[in-house]
């Protein structure tokens, strides 16, 4: 499915999958992709977030407030 993605995009999706597992979720949602973008740290998305002074810790705190962990 990800063969048409760039290496960086595949890395973000891999990190998003790790985040989904951390939340004990059986899906990859936008919240996981957002965390993956920030965690990857070097893509356009990560750089935009850095310029807005948004880091992984801040994003994780806000995601955890909004998203419940799975069973």
Locations of regions flagged by a protein language model:
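Histone-fold recognition with a strong bias for associated Lys/Arg-rich disordered tails
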Residues: 1-71
């Amino acid at each position: 499915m990800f063969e048409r993605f760039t290496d960086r995009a595949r890395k973000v999706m891999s990190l998003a999958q790790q985040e989904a597992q951390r939340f004990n979720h059986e899906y990859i949602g936008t919240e996981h992709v957002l965390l993956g973008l920030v965690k990857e740290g070097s893509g356009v998305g990560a750089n935009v977030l850095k310029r807005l002074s948004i880091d992984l810790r801040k994003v994780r705190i806000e995601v955890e407030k909004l998203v419940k962990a799975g069973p």
